[in-house]
């Protein structure tokens, strides 16, 4: 992408009906390290690949955030923007609990953060958030998995992935998602890790240092596994050749991974 006269702010449309600032923000998400979400009958699992530290003296940046006991999120894109949105959503959860003495409905949280994304592309003087979110939780409707993007769109998924080389992960999910409702928690975690492994570059193996695993579900609050807890899944983990699509860069139709849109009554 190159600078042109239509990309100076988010309120300037190109003659072809494009908002270049929003497209640039989407590129920040697409170039972020990969994150995967997988939903079963009773659980949702998030896995995310942390960026390599700049030097041996720095640590990996966190990619998953707990928002409330029943909900959390993983991010791809600008980590600072992700932290800002995590603080915003934590505040929304606390306000709802104070007013209603119950957990905030997940569809409401997804709509709220989608509206916040959209406000930042509707007015001059603001920039889009350069981050995408995978929001995972469990409420009265059961396990839920939502994805938000810089344009403000909100999607309800059975399984999805975002970030660099995420098409390879989505291809893996498309092949296996029909069996997810019958999986127990350990099997769901392994599916999420295999999908994440498919999105890694050559020579990179998932380990307890560069991989985040988070779980939430029936009777299980949102939990980001510690390194020792993650060791159960990652010690000896290897990406299998059959988990990597032959052509990872071909965009495929992933409509089957979608649930109903959040604004459609069930």
UniProtKB/Swiss-Prot annotation:
Cellular localization per UniProt: Cytoplasm; Nucleus
Keyword hit for Cytoplasm: yes
SMART domains in the record: Proteasome_A_N
CDD domains reported in the protein's UniProt record: proteasome_alpha_type_1 (cd03749)
SUPFAM superfamilies in the cross-refs: N-terminal nucleophile aminohydrolases (Ntn hydrolases)
Comp. bias regions, Acidic residues: 249-266
Family of the protein in this entry: Belongs to the peptidase T1A family.
Function according to Swiss-Prot or TrEMBL: The proteasome is a multicatalytic proteinase complex which is characterized by its ability to cleave peptides with Arg, Phe, Tyr, Leu, and Glu adjacent to the leaving group at neutral or slightly basic pH. The proteasome has an ATP-dependent proteolytic activity.
Protein name as it appears in the record: Proteasome subunit alpha type-1
């Amino acid at each position: 992408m190159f600078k042109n006269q239509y990309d100076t702010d988010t309120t300037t449309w190109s003659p072809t009906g494009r908002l270049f600032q929003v497209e640039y923000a989407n590129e920040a998400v697409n170039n972020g390290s990969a994150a995967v979400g997988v939903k079963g009958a009773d659980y949702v699992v998030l896995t995310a690949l942390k960026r390599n530290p700049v030097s041996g003296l720095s640590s990996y940046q966190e990619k998953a955030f707990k928002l409330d006991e029943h909900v959390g999120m993983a991010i791809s894109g600008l980590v600072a923007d992700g932290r800002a949105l995590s603080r915003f959503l934590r505040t929304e959860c606390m306000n709802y609990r104070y007013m209603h003495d119950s957990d905030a409905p997940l569809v409401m949280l997804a709509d709220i953060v989608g509206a916040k994304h959209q406000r930042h592309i509707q007015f001059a003087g603001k920039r889009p958030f350069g981050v995408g979110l995978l929001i995972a939780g469990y409420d009265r409707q059961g396990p839920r998995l939502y994805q938000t993007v810089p344009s403000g769109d909100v999607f309800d998924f059975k399984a999805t992935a975002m970030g660099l080389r995420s098409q390879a992960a989505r291809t893996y999910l498309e092949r296996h998602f029909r069996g997810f409702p019958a999986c127990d928690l350990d099997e769901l975690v392994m599916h999420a890790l295999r999908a994440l492994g498919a999105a890694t570059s050559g020579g990179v193996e998932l380990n307890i240092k560069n991989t985040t695993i988070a779980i939430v579900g029936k009777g299980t609050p949102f939990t980001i596994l510690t390194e020792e807890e993650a060791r159960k899944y990652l010690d000896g983990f290897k990406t299998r050749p059959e988990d990597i699509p032959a052509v990872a860069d071909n965009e495929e139709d992933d409509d089957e991974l979608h649930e109903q849109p959040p604004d459609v009554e069930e």
